[in-house]
Amino acid sequence: MIVRSFSAHILSDARFETYIPARASRSTASSRRRQSSRSIASSSSQTPRSSFEPLARVRTRADARVRAEDHAAGVFARDDGRPRVRGLARVRVARVEAHVDVERAIVSRGGRARSHISTPTSRDRETARSDERNNRRGSRRARAGARSAMLDAGARRLGRCHNALVTALLTDTYQLTMAYAYWRNGTHDRRAVFELFFRANPFQGEFTVFAGLEEALRFVSNFEFTERDVEYLKSTPVGENMEDEFFEFLLGLDASEVRVYAQKEGSVVFPRVPLLRLEGPLATVQLLETTLLCLVNYASLLATNAARHRLVAGQNAMLLEFGLRRAQGVDGGVSASRYAYLGGFDATSNVEAGRQFGIPIKGTHAHSYVQSHAGWGCVKNPKLVAADGSVCEDFPALVLEKMKSLEAIRDDMEVDLRWSETNTSELAAFTSYALAFPNAFLALVDTYNVLQSGLPNFCAVALALRELGYAAVGIRLDSGDLSYLSKRSRAFLRNIERLLGTKIADNLSAVSITASNDIHEEVLYSLRQHGHEIDAFGIGTHLVTCLKQPALGCVYKLVEVDGTPRIKLSEDIGKVTIPGCKNGYRLFSQTGEAIVDVMTRVGEPVPKVGERMLCRHPFMESKRAYVVPSKVAPLFDLVWDGARGVDPQVDLSLETSRARCKESIRQLRADHLR
């Protein structure tokens, strides 16, 4: 039993043995083929020579004709000599059996079989090519039919990934070269276990938020190589060295024999404890590596970054994701919006992300909107329908009236809050925007001068809207000293409300103040230390680019083959892997706080509530402690079960993952919230 603690790194009492990777043995399939050949030779020893020789020669031709079908369809010899079909690819079985019947018929006819062995003509070659094309079409139809049958049987499959670029070819070249080498060596079907994990928490923190599971399952659910994929691979220098039968093998490949165990999306996770555990044929699970890392690495890093911003900002502040324009590419922008929302942000400015994932969208206007107004002549439609249905024929005139009332009390305000003259073009811009959005008027007040122009102009428009039954939303600050400006802005609004009275300016001092000036964790800490009056933060660059740490560093390591643990050794102790197929559990204290994550070998006893256990770090012998858990929660769920698809009990909705993230962080001890 081996454990990974949250911060003390205390881990369990039963040791893993260290295994040196053994030489790859010949595959079970190869062994069965040898047994099959011996059985044929044995049975043929009683056959007249004239009968046996044609059988051997015709069998060679038959093997060549069906080999491609065997690899594409997943057909292999059984101990009894009959074909064995694996996974969803149950194709061409009747055709293979027909070849067996032909061979038996040839044996019975004796020497007549020689007439079937001749030099191939061009017509023969064309026929062979036609047969190959038909076989491919038949294989694809059979796979599609099998998948449909799986769905009809109640299995749950997900749609394709939201990014169309996520295909089987979204991988590194060496995944394909390894898959070919496995296939060429006959070891591609060995049962392997891989684990996806990371070695250190990001941002020098003490926790990580797991994200990207839904996209990972979408990829696994639809994993396949298309004919177009294969044609491209054949055209590459790497593919030129590969046999055609291997490409047929790829065309028949899917995740029907793969099982995926995972921690829950949105949960807090820790180093070394697997996020995903994949079990399946060696070549298949190897081919999944790069894509899964791509889907999980950035998602988890971004969700963690968002959660850290939420912790610093506090639970009451509104967090708005504004990072699309600074994101690293289109998918980086959309993914950032999605996983920022999962990590605790409230809304995004990204409209496409809102459409795809149901995230609330928010936004106001830019400086360019204010700059585009050169005066009152830019306000073309002055009419505004009031909240009660009456019509204000000249809303700009009402705004100017309110500005005069503000100027009348200007000298009664605190000295440093008095203004001299506002920018008329800015006032016209605010007025036209309020005409368009009377229910959602939030003004960017720092185009010219926050205290001398922006705030007085905002108040004039807000007071005019109030008279017509509308309530202004607030202001946005996008430059300057945010702590100072937010506090002076709140003081300005309170002065106006006090001097005009609640009848005219009720709740004006309570409008929202939003800040959006290159904000990141350190800025939020500084604002909290110096005090501020900000209600909402718009955060972009530092959130979506994860400027403080650009990558999480997830890895995908082989830990077991055919039931035998495998280990990766290194002079760098941090890169030594923990061998064997493992389960994980989270132990909780009596107060409901998470204490430690425990890893055990599959098949070992599950930790029990109330039973003392020694927990020990996997690499640091001195880090150990006894733990008596009040609650034990399994970490891994079987989320993908081959032909059965995605477990119906797995809730992959974004809202569920978001709520889980919040609850999981709430359960952490204070020393982990760093």
Task: Give each language-model segment a name.
Residues 2-7, 12-18, 23-51, 118, ...:
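Low-acidity, Ser/Thr- and Arg-rich intrinsically disordered low-complexity segments
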Residues 38, 46-48, 55-61, 67, ...:
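Compositionally biased, intrinsically disordered low-complexity segments enriched in Pro/Arg/Gln/His
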Residues 150-439, 452, 464-467, 471, ...:
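Ordered alpha/beta subdomains of enzyme catalytic regions
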Residues 444-447, 473-481, 512-516, 527, ...:
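Catalytic beta/alpha-barrel core
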Residues 6-9, 16-19, 35, 58, ...:
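Hydrophobic alpha-helical signal/anchor motif
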Residues 519-532:
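Catalytic cores of alpha/beta
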Residues 533-551:
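Glycine-rich phosphate-binding active-site loops on the catalytic face of alpha/beta enzymes
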Residues 263, 325-327, 513-521, 540-542:
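Glycine-rich beta-to-alpha transition loops that act as phosphate-gripper elements at the mouths
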